UniProtKB/Swiss-Prot annotation:
Belongs to the GTP cyclohydrolase I type 2/NIF3 family. A divalent metal cation 2 binds at H69, H333, E336. Pfam families: DUF34_NIF3. This is GTP cyclohydrolase 1 type 2 homolog. It comes from Bacillus subtilis (strain 168). Homohexamer. The keyword Metal-binding applies. A divalent metal cation 1 binds at H68, D107, E336. Signal peptide: none annotated. PANTHER family: GTP CYCLOHYDROLASE 1 TYPE 2 HOMOLOG (PTHR13799:SF14), NGG1 INTERACTING FACTOR 3 (PTHR13799).
Amino acid sequence: MAKSVNGQQIIQLFEQFSPKAYAVEGDKIGLQIGTLNKPIKNVMVTLDVLESVIDEAIEKEVDLIIAHHPPIFRSLKHISTDQPAGRLIEKCLKHDIAVYAAHTNLDVADGGVNDLLAEALELSETEVLAPTYTDPLKKLAVYVPKEYEEQVRAALGNAGAGHIGEYSHCAFSSEGIGSFKPLDGAKPFIGEVGELELVHEVRLETVFPKSVEKAVINAMIKSHPYEEVAYDIYPVEQTPAEKGLGRVGTLKNEMTLKEFALFVKDKLDVNGVRMVGDADSMVKKVAVLGGDGNKYIHHAKRKGADVYVTGDLYFHVAHDAMMLGLNVVDPGHYAEKIMKEGVTRKLTSMCNDKKFGVNIFVSETDTNPFTFL
């Protein structure tokens, strides 16, 4: 049976996938309008929050909007309902629609905007283009009755623990005898108050990135049968995986720059692309960064990319790329619309695992401001 859910629960789940810690300094992320302390039945995922998007949300009885681009990005000196920004906020509050933004944290996240773009372009052997965050690793050791081992193991893995490279749910267990004596006031799951108890237990060990520590601990406690869970958390010295903006990967087949530009147009489903470089030059290694990636052209060059795919390319930055000998294909900022389907799939899967009774769907409003002739 599906469980009712509130906004806090939805966002806590979402932030296991796209932690706030991944956002670059100063980014405007998180809850921007309304409250999460309310029941949620309908969630709409959008790239942008425009008044037309809010009108769609009202029509579809949306309780929560998850957006990539924050509607409140620049500081507001006042909120006037005579102005577009004020009207948008007023409509959200009037119709009890909460708006949550995941911006650069969603760019950085595994399976986020840049991974979705790299996947659409069929890149293999991908790595981070511009590191922005190192997520320190920690190790958890928890003591579990043997018959509850699999329950706790699954809960930890589903909360984000045990990810090593391309593997998830990695853990190690060893068996032993645990001992404890419940004191007055205790309500032991096993044993009697005042009597020493010896229990066949398993020491279950796994690693997790610091960014999901809260979720991992909550999952452990919720899935564990004991009222007082015995566990240890300590840092480990392995070098954690770098997180960051953009991706660099390799095409399956080498092609000319012109062929690649048309490939980008098709795969990202955009109305047109701009191209910088020799149309007949061959490309194989690709750097991609969703949105405005102007300041990362040198990162793309240092990574050995033959071509850099990014949006909002400036005139003089295009000249810089030419002088660097770096080809560029610009599909526009709206190529990030790919996040709508990607986030909807991911969050739907996570909510289904929790048996949350919530509908998650993609906004159908086209927020691209440009018309191509």
